[in-house]
UniProtKB/Swiss-Prot annotation:
GO biological process: iron-sulfur cluster assembly; protein maturation
Pfam families found in the cross-reference section: WD40 (PF00400)
Intervals holding WD repeats: 12-51, 58-97, 106-145, 151-190, 195-234, 245-284, 303-352
Protein name, entry field: Probable cytosolic iron-sulfur protein assembly protein CIAO1 homolog
InterPro entries in the record: CIAO1/Cia1, G-protein_beta_WD-40_rep, WD40/YVTN_repeat-like_dom_sf, WD40_repeat_CS, WD40_repeat_dom_sf, WD40_rpt
Length: 352
């Protein structure tokens, strides 16, 4: 079993925290929430993290999602005010500065999520208006809408990209997961995944790109894969269901950088960590499957005092994570954010 240990706790807000995102180097964390503030967090010394920059009133209403661009130069923030703002980060005068480049307008209600594609040239947004928007972000920092989709019958909760190609997924209150690709210069749904019995809050591809994980109001985490090539003619199927570990809605999940561990969190205040089989995904009769089932490898029953809304693994390898005394034996490192206004930093220790 893992040893999951809290190593730091930061009071980030007096209101709900909803979103966290690490830059690609794992050197800066951003947070956002109900207070409309975007905060950047960096190492104060070898052991502790602290606030390095704070931008109050970044939006007119709550900021539901913040995320770094793949290059680490830009941040996108999605708000209940119906807009998404693209910010440019600079290190002028030895301190971070944020410049608002453009506001993406078009959604007619709350924007719930924003996600950059791996190349950084496409941005996906989704919201309460049941729509998914695709935006092109070019080298001159110009943004234009390239597609508007309304494939769901209810609010769209999240969007996420495949790590190796321009394939997009969205999740919704309609209990469905839609998978999109570009065909003839337009984006279309080429697969719809049914299996959850209630709202699907989040779906995310593993960094290896061969598994899609989803979590739901039905208290289940499901793992999906496909025959053929993702984005081409492929038949999708659920290859595992992880249930019985959360007692209330599962809000978020996130893969570890090596695709071996999956973390989930929810309104039961819990943090759960699952281990994938050591021999990974295999194929029997041409169909993807596990020879052994994924297992719950560790959990924290009361990770926070209130709902845990977000969990994010820190990018990086063992060397750049394990140099400080406080986490000297840590192989991996993750963060959580909660309705209680705290960000928590956790070390994950286990035998290789």
């Amino acid at each position: 079993m893992l040893n999951v240990r809290e190593v730091q706790k930061l009071k980030a807000s007096n209101k709900r925290l909803w979103s966290l995102s690490w830059n690609h180097k794992g050197s800066v964390l951003i947070s956002s929430g109900e207070d409309r503030v975007i905060k950047l967090w960096a190492k104060c010394n070898d052991q502790l993290w602290g606030s390095s920059f704070s931008l109050p009133e970044a939006h007119k209403k709550s900021i539901r999602c913040v995320t770094w661009s793949p290059c680490g130069t830009y941040i996108a923030s999605a708000s209940f005010d119906g807009t998404v703002t693209i910010w440019k980060i600079s290190e002028a005068h030895s301190a971070p500065e944020m410049e608002a480049l453009v506001s993406l307008e078009g959604h007619t209600s709350e924007v719930k999520c924003v996600a950059w594609c791996p190349s950084g040239h496409l941005i996906a947004t989704c919201g309460r208006d049941k729509s998914v928007w695709l935006w092109e972000f070019d080298d001159e920092e110009d943004v234009q809408c390239v597609s508007v989709l309304q494939p769901h019958s209810q609010d769209v909760k999240s969007v996420a990209w495949h790590p190796h190609g321009e394939v997009l997924v969205s999740t919704s209150y309609d209990n469905k997961i839609n998978v999109y690709r570009e065909e003839l210069d337009d984006w279309t749904v080429f697969a719809q995944l049914s299996g959850h019995d209630s709202t699907v809050w989040k779906a995310e591809f593993s960094p290896s790109g061969d598994i899609l994980a989803s979590c739901s109001d039905d208290l289940c985490v499901k793992l999906w894969s496909w025959e053929g090539v993702c984005g081409k003619s492929s038949s999708w199927m659920c290859i595992a269901t992880l249930s019985g570990y959360h007692t209330r809605t599962i809000f978020d999940l996130n893969w570890s950088p090596d695709s071996q561990l999956l973390a989930s969190c929810g309104s039961d205040n819990r943090l759960c960590i699952y281990k994938m089989p050591a021999n990974g995904l295999t194929h029997i009769g041409g169909k993807p499957c596990f020879e052994e089932p994924p297992v719950l490898w560790g959990h924290v029953p009361n990770a926070h005092s209130e709902d845990v809304n977000c969990v994010r693994w820190k990018p990086g390898n063992i060397t750049d994570i394990s140099h400080s005394e406080s986490i000297s034996n840590c192989h991996l490192f993750l963060t959580t954010a909660s309705d209680d206004g705290y960000i928590k930093f956790w070390s994950i220790e286990y035998e290789l």
